[in-house]
């Protein structure tokens, strides 16, 4: 066809160019493009218009077609006018075309104009009108249509400017008028586009409607894909240098509402369990598969586009070849360059949409799994809780859940990498033909090698997670028992134990993983080289065509994509392995045995049923593990004998509980010696133990609870890290009157007066700032305030002194005015005074009820074999006889339940207050409902800390501004400077040899092109292979240096330093810092240092080097590129400057918002039995949702900020591709014209720049954010320490103290600087070997005195002198290791009895056994020796135990009762040869008989030592040489008991009189 042959009125037909010599587009081709784009937008616009019309998320009056309001926004009216004006201009163009006499215009032009007119009038105008009333954002089809119009009109104007005067046929419409119309269309399109992009605002009524409903208004598509919606936050944060209000951040999409997605995920998981498939993978896919699929579709499209790019590169290089360049005009090269640019930009948008979508899915998965783990942890049986330590469960949250999140966030690599490999190989086949088969064979050979190595990594990864669990468990236990560790001076063995797990197990295994991973990495790193060599070599040998630059460099681009895909395979394999291990661990946990209280028949009693017992138990045996687990292989026919043989006595918690009743309004007491099963009995009533039939097989087990509410007080008080008031309310509505009654009755008023902030005092983790008695009464107050029907109270009187005990009995339990007088109470106790007023007493022995009866009946029994009578006689003591006479009680009977109730609580310092029954019922009406305040979204934790309070919890420290240089230097120092230098050296050498590879390919291909054939193939392939092997070798050395030398060394040093710093911190640090926050440093932050930083730094420096090599290479050959690059660098720095401030602040918020999740988990695990008893699961689950939601909100904003920068910088990268191509075109036909080989090389590198900039952005951010983990670790490495452990200049003698004399001189101390003194001006001198009793009301400062002696508290003034030495002058280790103590909170550690008694290995086995026997612990250990630990199914380990010293102790001594743990502490004291022994309520949790035996042992074994005895039961110190009476931190009296008792005005006399000791 000739150039002037007319087709359908088109002089040049429909081809893109008129001819090869004309550097312009064919006007008819332009018209075709215009017509088709109009058709496309008509279709899309019609759909969007219909969707907009049907939108009902608007005010009611806008739901139908809205009419114009009387006052319309003037800007929007102008905008509608612009749209009409656009249509008018098109009509004018139609008129010009139709009435032209000079030129006949083609039909396609008229069609294009009509279609565009139809779009403007039929779609654009009604859409713009409706959007004002029914949309919060401008429509996407409008934005893209007018963007296209701007580009089209601009091109038409430029083509007219260059060619219109010489050839009118090259203009779409001829004449000056047409030019004016094109200019007007351009400016009008710009005006419409800018309005839609930046100015559009809906009617105010619609905006208010969205705010009213709490909806986050969506944004238009360009804002969505370019993240313009983040601009406001980014600019504000940059100006303020911090985030002003974390609670005002943009909300994440509805799909990230943790509460709703967690419920959906839980439903899917429950369905999986019901179908017996138990697949977590399937449950996750059902819940998040759609989001993941959409995101993966974006990335797959982007991957396909990246493969298309090299094909256009081949066309571009061909166009620069003098032999082929004459076929097309130079404009063709420009369009090819623009096509490469557009592909890059579209790929950028798709990639970033993929990332934000997949991150959204990952966050949802993490939030759902974390919620499910939390909920499951609250439902575990006692046996499962013994097996799964707090550290194990916290590790699931902090490591496993995060790994699964990362796996799904990298899901595209797992699926995309294989797709990329297939598509790239297909493209290579198209370019190189059958030579690609050589590459396929090479890849196939490597598969089995890597499969073998991958299996090895999986095995090692399982071991790694096991060791990580052990470490976190060890740290958790260490933190929970930190006070005992300091008192015993056990820091050194505990650090050695932790370091053993960390260094000798975890890091040693991590090193093995690194070695195997590096082998995989090296193998895969060689694959691209071998594929390239084999492919190019075979092509050169067997192809007739020369291996020219037009083939080499497009192939090289494809090989780079292949290299990237293959490069990700090793990490992909590791990710899959680690995730599968984590998934199995999570699945195992989620399938664990959980509390099943369905066997309990709960009845809300009607009026007719109130005479029936509140609790009934018949023919029931309780187990540590469910019968289904223990007898899974047993048939149902062999019911008793086989069950007993399989279950065994060691798995029975309570045996044959029969005919147990607690009548409504009765006080029922349960008694028994240490380890009899009293606490277990209460937990059984709560349904926390599985059960089976008792001795009567034919009768099913029965447990009936006729009540709607139960309150429970555990023996070890569970106190939340909150204020006193919040602990008492426990989520219930605040009622001032009943609250006041509660704190008075529970004897808390005097404590509130001395607490720094009254009932707003924050008590710290586990109530660490309270005494044991205060914690017990606070726990009791929580139970009383709940106003339940049934109360289960576990030995609540053991931790309080006699007077407080008497008042609690009178005002809470059985007195005439007692708050619980008409309630059903089951109380485990050994206090006879309360037993005398109970309606029934049950005696437990070895988990079985052996006898029952009321006090009078039992004591009148003539039978000397009565075990219960014997127990009661043992328990009887002066304290009990005395209390009876002082407590004003009436016998609790059933008839009292319905009598009018009058509560009267008398306090000596206040007026009497009376609450009648009718008033009380009004209080009770809403009492059990959780307060709405506990279920409202609360401000982020960082905003909750009240700095005004003296006891305010220390907010987690967050640095402001850039991460300081010293943090980077600290990490480099930890890694080792030499290792870091070698790492950089090997990295630079790798890039040098990579560059040499490509230059050799350029030389090879140009040589072939010049000769027209493939010559010296073996020489070229050989040299190329050698260079490639050198590159791979140096790359592997870089990896080895980073992982095996730098990273592991740095991790080891940082962990050791942090652990040492934490364990050496004073107790004030632990009182003000939640355990969860500390654990977060050792888990999440340490995991980031272990696993993330090494890869991030490697990728960062690799990307930097790639970018620098590209800039230098392209700039050297095209000097103008350096000018252009400088401009791009300025833009890069501009965006990075804005971005870095917000990203850093968000990362810090992410870190500190994660700590409350861990703290709540840790706290809930410790108090799960309380949460279960009060049925507060839903409230705590809500709190967990709330804390996870805050974290997710911050993470989503952080990820969106990353995408904001990524879009901009990757677009800069795409611009570099365009600039390189345009500059290459500019050199054509000049002296500096580049060879096709050089152009191919430069374009190959410029195509890599987008990817390099992407990685620079990602890794810069990730380094800046992950280094925050190092910053947080370094912060803990620099904690203010206690005094030095050993003072070399003033070390006491080995036998110090040799006498045991103690003198307090004007001694005062306080817990923290901002608190009032707790001990004031103490002046006491204790002679050697004196036995001194320390008495006083709970909270008087008795335990504080012992803490002062051990320098847990340092003096604010004065001093303590022991045997002539000021204890402030010597080291803490020398002091504490030379004193002995039996602390109030008895602690046991996971390990054996031996390691619990003698961690330093100082004593012989005979000495240890003697101490165990003297502490009366031997019978309990022998019983444990001949049975497995509760819930322990292991056969091997426990089967080999044949010595009581080797009996296993569970985490926190969970397989010992509180009393048994106190006996263990006594054994420790017996081993210590110290001349000074402190007994801090040492026998509070043991029965009377055991107490007497222990007291006799202490008197006998410690007769030649100084003993300070802190006691609640004053009878235990009446035989002391001296008595110290403390009151509000001051010594009120100090003399012998006889002298103090002879003075009837003395405080001690008053205490004894009130306690009944004078009788």
Curated annotation (Swiss-Prot):
Q: Which residues lie on this side of the membrane: Vacuolar?
A: 1-29, 106-110, 161-178, 305-333, 432-434, 540-560, 994-1030, 1117, 1231-1235
Q: Which UniProt keywords apply?
A: ATP-binding, Glycoprotein, Membrane, Nucleotide-binding, Phosphoprotein, Repeat, Transmembrane, Transmembrane helix, Transport, Vacuole
Q: Which residues are glycosylated?
A: 1011
Domain of life, per the record? Eukaryota
Detail which positions bind ATP 2.
1336-1343
Please indicate the ranges of residues that lie on the Cytoplasmic side.
51-84, 128-139, 200-283, 355-410, 456-518, 582-972, 1053-1095, 1139-1209, 1257-1559
Pfam families membership: ABC_membrane, ABC_tran, TMD0_ABC
Q: Supply the SMART domains for this chain.
A: AAA
* Gene Ontology terms: biological process: bilirubin transport; cadmium ion transport; transmembrane transport; vacuole fusion, non-autophagic
Q: Write out the transmembrane intervals.
A: 30-50, 85-105, 111-127, 140-160, 179-199, 284-304, 334-354, 411-431, 435-455, 519-539, 561-581, 973-993, 1031-1052, 1096-1116, 1118-1138, 1210-1230, 1236-1256
Q: Which InterPro entries match?
A: AAA+_ATPase (IPR003593), ABC1_TM_dom (IPR011527), ABC1_TM_sf (IPR036640), ABC_transporter-like_ATP-bd (IPR003439), ABC_transporter-like_CS (IPR017871), ABC_transporter_C-like (IPR050173), ABCC_6TM_D1 (IPR044746), P-loop_NTPase (IPR027417)
Tell me which positions the record assigns to the signal sequence: none
Domain ABC transporter: from-to ranges: 639-871, 1302-1553
Reported function: Cooperates for the ATP-dependent vacuolar transport of bilirubin and glutathione conjugates.
What is the official name of this protein in its record?
Answer: Bile pigment transporter 1
Q: What is the originating organism of this protein?
A: Saccharomyces cerevisiae (strain ATCC 204508 / S288c)
């Amino acid at each position: 066809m000739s150039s002037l042959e007319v087709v359908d009125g088109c002089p040049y037909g429909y081809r893109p160019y008129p001819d090869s010599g004309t550097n312009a587009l064919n006007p008819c081709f332009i018209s075709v493009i215009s017509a088709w784009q109009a058709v496309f937008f008509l279709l899309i616009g019609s759909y969007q218009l219909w969707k907009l019309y049907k939108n009902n998320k608007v005010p009611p009056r806008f739901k139908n077609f809205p009419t114009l309001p009387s006052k319309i926004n003037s800007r929007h009216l102008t905008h509608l006018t612009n749209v009409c004006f656009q249509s008018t201009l098109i009509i004018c163009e139609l008129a010009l075309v139709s009435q032209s006499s000079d030129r006949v215009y083609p039909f396609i032009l008229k069609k294009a104009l009509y279609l565009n007119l139809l779009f403007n009038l039929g779609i654009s105008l009604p859409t713009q009108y409706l959007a004002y009333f029914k949309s919060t954002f401008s429509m996407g089809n409008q934005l893209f249509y007018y963007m296209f119009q701007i580009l089209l009109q601009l091109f038409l104007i430029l083509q007219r400017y260059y060619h219109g005067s010489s050839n009118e046929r090259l203009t779409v419409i001829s004449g000056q008028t047409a030019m004016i119309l094109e200019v007007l269309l351009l400016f009008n399109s710009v005006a419409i586009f800018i309005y839609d992009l930046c100015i559009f605002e809906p009617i105010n009524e619609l905006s208010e409607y969205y705010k009213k409903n709490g909806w986050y208004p969506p944004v238009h598509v360009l804002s969505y894909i370019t993240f313009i919606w983040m601009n406001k936050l980014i600019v504000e944060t940059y100006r303020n240098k911090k985030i002003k209000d974390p609670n005002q951040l943009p909300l994440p999409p509805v799909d990230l509402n943790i509460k709703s997605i967690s419920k959906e995920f839980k439903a899917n998981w429950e369905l999986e369990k019901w179908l017996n498939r138990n697949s977590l993978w399937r449950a996750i896919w059902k819940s998040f598969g759609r989001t993941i699929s959409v995101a993966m579709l974006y990335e797959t499209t982007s991957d396909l586009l990246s493969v298309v790019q090299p094909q256009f590169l081949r066309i571009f290089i061909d166009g620069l070849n003098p032999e082929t360049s004459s076929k097309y005009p130079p404009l063709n090269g420009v369009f090819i360059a623009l096509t490469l640019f557009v592909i890059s930009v579209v790929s950028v948008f798709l990639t970033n949409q993929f990332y934000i979508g997949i991150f959204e899915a990952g966050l949802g998965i993490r939030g759902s799994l974390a919620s499910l783990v939390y909920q499951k942890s609250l439902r575990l049986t006692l046996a499962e809780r013994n097996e799964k330590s707090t550290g194990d469960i916290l590790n699931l949250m902090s490591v496993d859940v995060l790994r699964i999140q990362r796996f799904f966030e990298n899901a595209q690599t797992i699926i995309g990498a294989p797709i990329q490999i297939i598509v790239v190989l297909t493209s290579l086949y198209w370019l190189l033909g059958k030579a690609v088969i050589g590459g396929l064979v090479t890849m196939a050979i490597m598969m089995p090698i890597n499969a073998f190595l991958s299996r090895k990594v999986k095995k090692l990864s399982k071991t790694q997670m096991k060791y990580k669990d052990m470490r976190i468990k060890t740290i958790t236990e260490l933190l929970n028992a930190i006070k005992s560790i300091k008192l015993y001076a056990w820091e050194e063995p505990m650090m050695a134990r932790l370091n053993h797990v960390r260094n000798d197990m975890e890091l040693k295994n991590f090193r093995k993983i690194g070695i195997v991973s590096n082998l995989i990495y090296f193998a895969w790193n060689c694959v691209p080289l071998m594929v390239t060599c084999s492919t190019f070599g075979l092509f050169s040998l067997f192809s007739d065509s020369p291996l020219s630059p037009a083939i080499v460099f497009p192939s090289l681009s494809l090989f780079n994509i292949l290299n990237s895909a293959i490069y990700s395979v090793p990490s992909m394999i590791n990710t899959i392995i680690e995730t599968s291990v984590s998934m199995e661990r999570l699945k195992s946990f989620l399938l664990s045995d959980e509390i099943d209280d369905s066997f309990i028949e709960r009845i809300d009693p009607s009026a007719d049923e109130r005479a029936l017992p509140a609790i009934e138990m018949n023919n029931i045996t309780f187990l540590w593990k469910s019968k289904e687990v223990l007898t899974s292989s047993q048939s149902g026919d062999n019911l008793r004998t086989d069950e007993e043989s399989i279950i065994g006595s060691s798995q029975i918690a309570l045996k044959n509980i029969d005919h147990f009743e607690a009548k409504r309004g009765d006080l029922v007491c349960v008694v028994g010696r240490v380890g009899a099963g009293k606490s277990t009995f209460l937990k059984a009533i709560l349904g926390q133990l599985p059960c089976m039939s008792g001795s009567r097989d034919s009768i099913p087990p029965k447990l009936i609870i006729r009540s709607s509410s139960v309150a429970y007080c555990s023996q070890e008080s569970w106190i939340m890290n909150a204020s006193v008031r919040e602990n008492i309310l426990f989520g219930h509505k605040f009622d001032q009157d009943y609250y006041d009654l509660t704190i008075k009755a529970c004897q808390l008023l005097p404590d509130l007066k001395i607490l720094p902030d009254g009932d707003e005092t924050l008590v710290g983790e586990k109530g660490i700032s309270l005494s044991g008695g205060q914690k017990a009464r606070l726990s009791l107050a929580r139970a009383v305030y709940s106003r339940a029907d049934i109360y289960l109270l576990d030995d609540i009187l053991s931790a309080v002194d006699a007077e407080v005990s008497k008042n609690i009995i009178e005002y809470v339990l059985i007195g005439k005015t007692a708050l619980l007088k008409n309630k059903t109470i089951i109380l485990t106790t050994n206090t006879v005074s309360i037993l005398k007023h109970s309606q029934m007493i049950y005696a437990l022995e070895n988990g079985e009820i052996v006898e029952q009866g009321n006090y009078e009946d039992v004591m009148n029994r003539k039978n000397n074999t009565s075990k219960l009578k014997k127990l009661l006689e043992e328990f009887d003591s002066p304290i009990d006889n005395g209390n009876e006479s002082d407590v004003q009680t009436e016998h609790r009977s059933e008839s009292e339940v319905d009598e009018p109730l009058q509560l009267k609580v008398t306090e000596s310092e206040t007026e009497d207050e009376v609450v009648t029954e009718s008033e009380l019922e009004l209080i009770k009406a809403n009492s059990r409902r959780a307060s709405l305040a506990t279920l409202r979204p609360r401000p982020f934790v960082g905003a909750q800390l009240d700095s005004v309070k003296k006891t305010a919890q220390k907010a987690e420290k967050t640095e402001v501004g850039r991460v300081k240089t010293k943090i980077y230097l600290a990490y480099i120092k930890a890694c080792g400077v030499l290792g870091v230098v070698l790492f950089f050296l090997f990295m630079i050498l790798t890039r040098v040899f990579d560059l040499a590879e490509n230059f050799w390919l350029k030389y090879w291909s140009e040589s072939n092109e010049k000769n027209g054939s493939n010559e010296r193939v073996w020489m070229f392939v050989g040299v190329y292979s050698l260079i490639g092997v050198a590159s791979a070798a140096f790359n592997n050395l870089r990896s080895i240096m980073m992982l095996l030398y730098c990273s592991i060394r740095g991790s080891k040093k940082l962990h050791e330093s942090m652990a040492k710093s934490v364990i050496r911190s004073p107790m004030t640090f632990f009182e003000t810092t939640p355990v969860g926050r500390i654990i977060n440093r050792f888990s999440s932050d340490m995991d980031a240092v272990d696993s993330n930083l090494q890869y991030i730094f490697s990728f960062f420096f690799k990307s930097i080097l790639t970018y620098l090599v590209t800039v230098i290479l392209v700039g050297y050959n095209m000097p103008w590129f350096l000018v252009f690059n400088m401009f791009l660098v300025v833009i890069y720095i501009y965006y990075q400057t804005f971005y870095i401030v917000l990203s850093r602040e968000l990362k810090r918020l992410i870190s500190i918002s994660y700590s409350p999740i861990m703290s709540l988990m840790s706290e809930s695990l410790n108090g799960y039995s309380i949460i279960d008893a009060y049925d507060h699961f839903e409230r705590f689950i809500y709190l967990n949702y709330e804390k996870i939601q805050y974290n997710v909100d911050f993470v989503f904003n952080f990820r969106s900020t990353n995408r904001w920068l990524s879009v901009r910088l990757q677009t800069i990268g795409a611009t570099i591709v365009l600039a390189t191509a345009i500059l290459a075109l500019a050199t054509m036909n000049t002296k500096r014209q580049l060879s096709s080989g050089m152009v191919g090389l430069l374009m190959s590198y410029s195509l890599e720049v987008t990817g390099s900039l992407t990685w620079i952005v990602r890794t810069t951010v990730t380094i800046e954010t992950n280094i925050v983990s190092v910053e947080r670790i370094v912060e803990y490495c620099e904690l203010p320490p206690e005094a030095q452990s050993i003072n070399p200049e003033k070390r006491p003698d080995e036998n110090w103290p040799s006498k045991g004399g103690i003198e307090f001189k004007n001694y005062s101390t306080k817990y923290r600087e901002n608190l009032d003194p707790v001990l004031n001006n103490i002046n006491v001198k204790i002679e050697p070997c004196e036995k001194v009793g320390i008495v006083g009301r709970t909270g008087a400062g008795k335990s504080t005195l012992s803490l002062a002696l051990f320098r847990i508290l340092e003096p604010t003034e004065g001093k303590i002198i022991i045997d002539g030495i000021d204890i402030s002058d010597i080291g803490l280790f020398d002091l504490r290791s030379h004193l002995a103590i039996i602390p109030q909170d008895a602690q046991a550690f996971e390990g054996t009895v031996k390691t619990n008694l003698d961690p330093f290995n100082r004593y012989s086995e005979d000495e240890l056994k003697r101490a165990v026997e003297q502490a009366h612990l031997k019978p309990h250990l022998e019983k444990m020796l001949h049975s497995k630990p509760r819930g322990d199914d292991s056969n091997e380990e426990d089967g080999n135990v044949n010595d009581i010293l080797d009996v296993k102790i569970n985490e926190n001594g969970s397989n010992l009762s509180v009393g048994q743990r106190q006996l263990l502490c006594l054994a420790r004291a017996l081993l210590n040869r110290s001349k000074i022994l402190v007994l801090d309520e040492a026998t509070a949790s043991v029965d009377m008989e055991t107490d007497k035996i222990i007291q006799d042992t202490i008197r006998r074994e410690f007769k030649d030592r100084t003993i300070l005895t802190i006691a609640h039961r004053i009878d235990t110190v009446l035989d002391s040489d001296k008595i110290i009476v403390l009151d509000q931190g001051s010594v009120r009296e100090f003399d012998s008991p006889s002298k103090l008792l002879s003075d009837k005005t003395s405080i001690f006399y008053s205490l004894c009189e009130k306690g009944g000791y004078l009788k």
